[in-house]
Amino acid sequence: MYCLQWLLPVLLIPKPLNPALWFSHSVFMGFYLLSFLLERKPCTICALVFLGALFLICYSCWGNCFLYHCSASELPEAAYDPAVVGT
């Protein structure tokens, strides 16, 4: 499970507060994961463990999924601050 040390930190990268940056963040993360899987070719067990963890995080809709924003979860308080959104 040596290859998991390069995949698990990806789940800890936070989404940006600005909703306008969510799409570019998800595209970047998707391309990063695709290029990592094609270049490093992790073992099947590591890939399944990572995809299972990613599925559970996105399915639970806690707001940590980088692929999309759940409609049921609310935006953070800082997202309504014009000083943060304007940056």
From Swiss-Prot:
Belongs to the BLCAP family. It comes from the Eukaryota. It holds the Pfam family BC10. It is a multi-pass membrane protein. PANTHER family: BLADDER CANCER 10 KD PROTEIN HOMOLOG, BLADDER CANCER-ASSOCIATED PROTEIN. This is Apoptosis inducing factor BLCAP B. It comes from Xenopus laevis. The chain crosses the membrane at residues 19-39, 43-63. Coiled coil: none annotated. Acts as a tumor suppressor; induces growth arrest at G(1)/S checkpoint and apoptosis via RB1-dependent and p53/TP53- and NF-kappa-B-independent mechanisms. Modulates expression of genes involved in the regulation of proliferation, cell cycle and apoptosis. Keywords: Cytoplasm, Membrane, Nucleus, Transmembrane, Transmembrane helix, Tumor suppressor.
